[in-house]
Amino acid sequence: MVKLVVGIGNPGRQYVWTRHNIGFLLLDSLASRFLGAFREAPRLYASFAKVEISSEAVVLMKPTTYVNLTGKAVLAAKKFFDVSMEDILVVADDINREFGFVRFRQDCGSGGHNGIKNTTQILQSNHYWQLRLGVGRPSYPGAEGVADYVLSSFSLNEKEKLNDFLEKGIEEIFPWLGC
């Protein structure tokens, strides 16, 4: 049996440290911890790393489709690795929660996240797991739009807390991974 962990984010160096790419950042942390190396898989519309966690085969996947088209890559990987819906986890940013908030659950809505919406639409089901990582919402006067906000870099204060936040997210999914 294989588990598929999909980080939602945008490809390209300009997006690496943006709020929308927190899913990719969490997968990078997991890959580093379990000695996985990402490689390109054009026919899966993604780069992926295979790791073993608690004797469980786990595929870490970062779609190359941009956030709003994530479902195409998830479906391709689901078919290629023959993964059941219960063994899919999608990691995404959540602007409806403050920075540092972590939520892990199954069978839930998109919360307005276009990558989650697209994944649910393409899979024709929301019966997969989600790890939502709060990145906050702009609240100061003259705040940039939501799209600009999620495509902007973390604040200095957030960067100082980012490793602990990612660790908190990883710990939240360890039971699902069998740890």
Curated annotation (Swiss-Prot):
Catalysed reactions listed for this entry: an N-acyl-L-alpha-aminoacyl-tRNA + H2O = an N-acyl-L-amino acid + a tRNA + H(+)
Q: Where in the cell is it found?
A: Cytoplasm
Matching Pfam families: Pept_tRNA_hydro (PF01195)
Q: Name one GO molecular function term.
A: tRNA binding
**Keywords associated with the record:** Cytoplasm, Hydrolase, RNA-binding, tRNA-binding
- Could you say which residues bind tRNA here? 15, 66, 68, 114
The protein's Enzyme Commission number: 3.1.1.29
Any one Gene Ontology cellular component term annotated for this protein = cytoplasm
Q: Where is this site: Discriminates between blocked and unblocked aminoacyl-tRNA?
A: 10
Q: Biological process GO annotation list?
A: protein quality control for misfolded or incompletely synthesized proteins; rescue of stalled ribosome
List the residue(s) that the UniProt entry marks as the site Stabilizes the basic form of H active site to accept a proton. Answer: 93
Which residues are annotated as active site? 20 (proton acceptor)
Q: Which InterPro entries match?
A: Pept_tRNA_hydro, Pept_tRNA_hydro_CS, Pept_tRNA_hydro_sf
Q: How does it assemble?
A: Monomer.
Q: What's this chain's function?
A: Hydrolyzes ribosome-free peptidyl-tRNAs (with 1 or more amino acids incorporated), which drop off the ribosome during protein synthesis, or as a result of ribosome stalling. Catalyzes the release of premature peptidyl moieties from peptidyl-tRNA molecules trapped in stalled 50S ribosomal subunits, and thus maintains levels of free tRNAs and 50S ribosomes.
Q: Which family does it belong to?
A: Belongs to the PTH family.
Any idea what this protein is called? Answer: Peptidyl-tRNA hydrolase
